[in-house]
């Protein structure tokens, strides 16, 4: 029996709250600050976001990887997540690095922000675990100012458990990402960037582009995807 929306999100949030303290220690999730991969991520995010300073929302921020890079680049950043444990880790990282970003509880499908208040919305390693992606992208578009952009960075999983290592040890991933949960996450099963492009176009964005981050993939110590990360972008007219 398919799970209802609330039960799906509860399982997802519980999983990421459990793994939050160890999330950054896995190189497939977050590269070390001094690594060539981290430098490459800074360059990529700088290229993908509008000129600074811009109002940026990082959806599914987790431990704040993208938010903190955007802050470092000079943007005004809000990162939202439903895992309080992940947000706590993000705040620790911000304090440790002397960076300013606002981290708050927020549902990715219906972010708690005013309409027409943002210049960019970005998410990384998140689309695959987003319920109701079609609804979410429509709602994201409403938050953007004219000419605001959406940036979706993700990839296609090697298999349904590789991305969660080492957290998957002991079957933790399968206990929370049950068959019923997976059925409610359509992008988890996608294997084509064309589907991602169709998602962004279907939400009403124009000038939709899809590219890859092959340069970062080559530098990654333990990339979570067999193929390079993809980047889908779109503009609100």
Residue spans of the language-model regions?
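Conserved class I S-adenosyl-L-methionine
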Residues: 1-52, 168, 214
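C-terminal alpha-helical "lid/dimerization" subdomain adjacent to the S-adenosyl-L-methionine
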Residues: 10, 153-222
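Nucleotide donor/acceptor-binding cores
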Residues: 53-55, 116
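Class I SAM-dependent methyltransferase SAM/SAH-binding core
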Residues: 55-59, 63-110
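A short acidic, Gly/Pro-enriched loop at the edge of an enzyme's catalytic core
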Residues: 109-121
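A short SAM/SAH-binding and catalytic strip from SAM-dependent methyltransferases
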Residues: 120-133
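A short glycine-rich, Lys/Arg-flanked "PGG" loop and its adjoining helix->strand segment in the class I
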Residues: 134-146
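Core SAM-dependent methyltransferase catalytic element
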Residues: 220-237
């Amino acid at each position: 029996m398919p799970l209802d929306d609330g039960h799906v999100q509860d399982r997802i949030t519980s999983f990421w709250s459990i793994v939050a303290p160890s999330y950054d220690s896995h190189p497939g999730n977050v590269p070390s600050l001094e690594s060539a991969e981290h430098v490459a991520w800074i360059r990529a995010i700088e290229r993908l976001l509008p000129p600074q300073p811009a109002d940026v929302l990082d959806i599914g921020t987790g431990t704040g990887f993208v938010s903190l890079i955007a802050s470092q680049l000079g943007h005004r950043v809000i990162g939202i997540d439903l895992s309080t444990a992940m947000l706590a880790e993000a705040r620790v990282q911000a304090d440790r690095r002397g960076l300013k970003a606002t981290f708050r509880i927020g549902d990715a499908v219906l972010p708690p922000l005013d309409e027409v208040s943002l210049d960019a919305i970005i998410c990384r390693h998140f689309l695959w675990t987003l319920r109701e992606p079609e609804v979410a992208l429509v709602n994201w578009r409403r938050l953007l100012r004219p000419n605001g952009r959406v940036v979706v960075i993700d990839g296609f999983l090697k298999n349904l458990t590789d991305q969660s290592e080492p957290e998957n040890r002991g079957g933790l991933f399968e206990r929370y990402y049950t068959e019923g949960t997976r059925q409610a996450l359509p992008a988890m099963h996608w294997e084509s960037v064309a589907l991602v492009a169709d998602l962004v176009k279907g939400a009403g964005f124009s000038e939709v582009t899809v590219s890859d981050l092959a340069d970062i993939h080559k530098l990654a110590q333990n990339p979570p995807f067999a193929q390079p990360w993809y980047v889908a972008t779109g503009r609100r007219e």
